[in-house]
A protein has these predicted regions:
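C-terminal structural segment of proteins
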Residues: 1-326
Length: 326
């Protein structure tokens, strides 16, 4: 591990001032410190922002939430306002990592965690995300757990966060403090597809600090489902965050986002469009899933993710509609 200095920020303004010359923000450190040990990340300075006053979950009168970026994953999942009004978010958080890691990991850090692609984590191997221009050996190598949607010749990595998938389905917004002041962006605009710059995971600018996540009221049943290679402490092969409002047998509103299939949480806009106003039947859910997955471009060894994602969409929607087994 490269030598580094450690500083604790006392405010957002102080954090911005300290973020220069190779500095990196430190929250819980559950991903960053691992990457430092591997030599993937080599910051010269860590600026600790975990103790800034962003550690609360606020329930607004309209049922929306403001979640501070320093809230731990454990506290978020246990918060009664989250468990009652945004079940999909609590479920997603509890399906990520282990209890010990959730105790340390923060909301802001969870959103910014980096891919678990084995080539990215091995500094002896080329990787366009870690070393731009060096190539993407995963395309012809080990990629059974990598992307089937939105990837590019430069990168087939997937985003690892369960929480981010749920927040995408919830139409969350990200509150950011930057050098030009504060701004709020849709979570859809936070993470990037790889394109020809896979080293850029997000649209954040130098020094930008996530301070909170705003989550609108939901008002319909929701669920998070995750398929993984073992029962716990494993990243998704495919996951889904779903919410469904059925009235008089018709889909009034629906939210769908997929994890484990793309470089970012994949909002299933095509499937949502196909479902609104349709009958809430498994046949309609099947057609919507197929419409979404028409864009899939599986590689040699991850084609199984297409039927897996399709079946997960259909099963989860059927559960929410009361037409399938839970």
């Amino acid at each position: 591990m490269r030598p580094f200095t450690y500083e604790r920020a006392t405010s957002a303004e102080d954090a911005l001032e300290r973020h220069n010359g190779g500095a990196v923000y430190l929250g819980g450190g559950t991903n960053l410190v691992d990457l430092m040990r591997l030599g993937v990340e080599e910051p010269g300075r860590l600026v600790d922002v975990a103790h800034l006053p962003y550690g609360e979950v606020e329930l607004r009168p309209d049922g929306s939430l403001v979640i501070g970026a320093a809230v731990s994953n454990s506290d978020l999942a246990a918060d009664p306002t989250v468990r009652e009004g945004h079940q999909v978010l609590a479920q997603a958080v509890l399906m990520g990592a282990s209890g010990q890691i959730r105790n340390l990991a923060t909301v802001g850090g969870n959103l910014l965690q980096r891919t678990r692609c084995s080539y990215f984590q091995d500094t002896a191997k080329p990787c366009n995300k870690r070393n731009p221009g060096s190539g993407c050996p995963a395309r012809e190598g080990e990629h059974h757990n990598l992307a089937i949607l939105g990837h590019s010749p430069a990168c087939v990595a997937t985003h690892p966060s369960d929480m981010a998938v749920a927040l995408a389905a919830l139409n969350a917004s990200i509150r950011i403090r930057g050098r030009a002041g504060e701004r709020t962006i849709p979570i859809e605009d936070l993470h990037r597809l790889p394109g020809d710059e896979p080293q850029r995971d997000t649209t954040l600018e130098d020094g930008d600090l996530i301070t909170a996540v705003e989550v609108p009221a939901l008002g319909m049943p929701s669920r998070y489902r995750k398929v993984r290679e073992r029962a716990s402490f494993a990243f998704a092969l495919v996951s889904i965050a779903a919410a469904l409002d059925v009235r008089d047998g018709l889909v009034h509103d629906v939210r769908l986002a997929l994890g484990g299939v793309a470089h970012k949480p994949w909002r299933a806009w095509r499937a949502e469009e196909a479902l609104r106003g349709a009958e809430a039947t498994e046949e309609a859910f099947q057609r919507a899933a197929e419409a979404e997955l028409e864009a899939a471009e599986p590689l040699r060894d991850n084609g199984y993710k297409v039927p897996l994602a399709r079946n997960l969409i259909v099963r989860t929607l059927a559960e929410l509609a009361g037409t399938g087994e839970s």
